Structures are given as C-alpha cells and as structure tokens.
C-alpha cells in the first residue's frame, strides 16, 4: 500500500483545511516546492497536490506553484482541484504531472471522464468526496443526492486509473479514516481505491492495510505528517514491510 503525502495549495502556499472550510486553514510551508522535496527525501513514491483555490473557483489558480513542485521532484505527482475540461487536463499533463484528478466534473459531467480516459489512458483519476455516503462537490460546498458507490460504478468500464475516496467529515480532523465506507466502495468496483481523510496515527494506516485486499491500494495523508502526528518515513516503512511479505 502506497503512503501518499498531500500538498494543499492556497494562495501559492502549502496549507491544511479543517473539513474543507477555506476560512479554517493553517499555513505549513510558504515554499511548496521545498515541501515536496522533503516528502520525496523521506521516501514518498507519489505526491498528491490539491489546488484548493481552483477547487472552489472551478479554474486553475496555483499553476506557478504546481510547476515549481513538478520541476523540484523526480517522483510522480497527481493533481486535483478546478479541473473541469480536457484543455485544463492537457495543460497540466504537459507540465509533467503524471495524473490528474477529476472531482466535481466527474459527478456533473461523467462524459468528460470517459473522454479524458480515452485521450490520456492511465492518467485519469476520479476524486469522490462524500459526506454520510453522499457525494459532495464544488470544493465540498454542495452535497448531492448521489451515493459514492453509485458514482464510482459509472466509471467502471472507462479505464479510470484510481478512485480517491475522501470522507469529508473526517478530513483534517485527525479522527481516523472511515474504514467501513472505504471498504464498501472498494468492494463495489474493480477500480483501485486510494483512501483519504482523517488519517492521524500509524494505527489508522495499519487499519487501512487490513482492507488492502478489498482493493484499497493507497492512503493519502496530510495534516498528520505536517503536525508530526505521523512521521512519513515511518508510515512508508510500515506499509513497505507489508508489500514485501
């Protein structure tokens, strides 16, 4: 199981939000590229970047910071936030990003996901954010009437590389991930699932490792590695042992 460090960008700096609320942010580093390099040096094999301003605005907002991150690291990086059309996807992939994440647009325009997968095979990830099992969009500002499982099933046959599943009520709260909801989603589809939201201790990662066989292939961690609640290199060592058995 991959442990994937997150870099959330707001106004060009590295922040963390509580429950996706833009007015509840903490700045952790004003140099996102140096932060990305730090996670790479601790053993990260993949970086997760979110353009928070883009997620709320619906268009890219932190391109300079994203470009600086990609230039600084040699590991793959994936990006989400404000990606609503093929032109934006193409523009980001041309910067050197390995994968892009379609979130709000996946719910509002499933055809975009299908077209993107056809044009950029293996490089499209769907981000599904849910509150009490229901999909939330527009930077989590709006909860829809569709379940996370029903949305995931729409993309079963179009070549999505992975689904990132975030339980919003857990995100940034350091309360532990929603194991059962993550397992249910992973078992409902054949697409690999990456868990996100609420990971606060190594024990949380151990708990997620118990559902790896259900199709959970990675875990994104943000706030916990910035506050020191989890040391990234220790989490990577923990999951690495599991990978070698």
Swiss-Prot record:
The active site is at 8 (proton acceptor), 129 (proton donor). GO terms for molecular function: 1-(5-phosphoribosyl)-5-[(5-phosphoribosylamino)methylideneamino]imidazole-4-carboxamide isomerase activity. It catalyses: 1-(5-phospho-beta-D-ribosyl)-5-[(5-phospho-beta-D-ribosylamino)methylideneamino]imidazole-4-carboxamide = 5-[(5-phospho-1-deoxy-D-ribulos-1-ylimino)methylamino]-1-(5-phospho-beta-D-ribosyl)imidazole-4-carboxamide. Keywords: Amino-acid biosynthesis, Cytoplasm, Histidine biosynthesis, Isomerase. Signal peptide: none annotated. Its main location: cytoplasm. CDD domains: HisA (cd04732). Pathway: Amino-acid biosynthesis; L-histidine biosynthesis; L-histidine from 5-phospho-alpha-D-ribose 1-diphosphate: step 4/9. This is 1-(5-phosphoribosyl)-5-[(5-phosphoribosylamino)methylideneamino] imidazole-4-carboxamide isomerase. It comes from Pelobacter propionicus (strain DSM 2379 / NBRC 103807 / OttBd1).
């Amino acid at each position: 199981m991959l442990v994937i460090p997150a870099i959330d960008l707001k106004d060009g700096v590295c922040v963390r939000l509580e429950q996706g609320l833009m007015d509840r942010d903490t700045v952790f580093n004003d140099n996102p590229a140096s932060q990305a390099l730090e996670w790479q040096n601790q053993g990260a094999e993949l970086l997760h970047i979110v353009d928070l301003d883009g997620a709320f605005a619906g268009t890219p907002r932190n391109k300079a910071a994203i470009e600086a991150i990609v230039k600084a690291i040699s590991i793959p990086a994936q990006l989400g936030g404000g990606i609503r059309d093929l032109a934006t996807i193409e523009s980001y992939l041309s910067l050197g990003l390995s994968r892009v994440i379609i979130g709000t647009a996946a719910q509002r325009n499933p055809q975009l996901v299908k077209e993107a997968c056809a044009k950029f095979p293996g490089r499209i990830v769907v981000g599904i954010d849910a509150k009490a099992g229901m999909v939330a969009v527009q930077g989590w500002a709006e909860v829809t009437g569709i379940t996370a499982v029903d949305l995931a099933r729409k993309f079963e046959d179009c070549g999505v590389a992975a689904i990132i599943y975030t339980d919003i009520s857990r995100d940034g709260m350091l309360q532990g991930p929603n194991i059962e909801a993550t397992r249910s989603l992973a078992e409902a589809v054949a697409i690999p699932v990456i868990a996100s939201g609420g990971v606060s201790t190594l024990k949380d990662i151990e708990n997620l490792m118990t559902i790896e066989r259900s199709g959970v292939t990675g875990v994104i961690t943000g706030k916990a590695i910035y506050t020191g609640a989890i040391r990234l290199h220790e989490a990577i060592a923990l999951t690495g042992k599991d990978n070698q058995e």
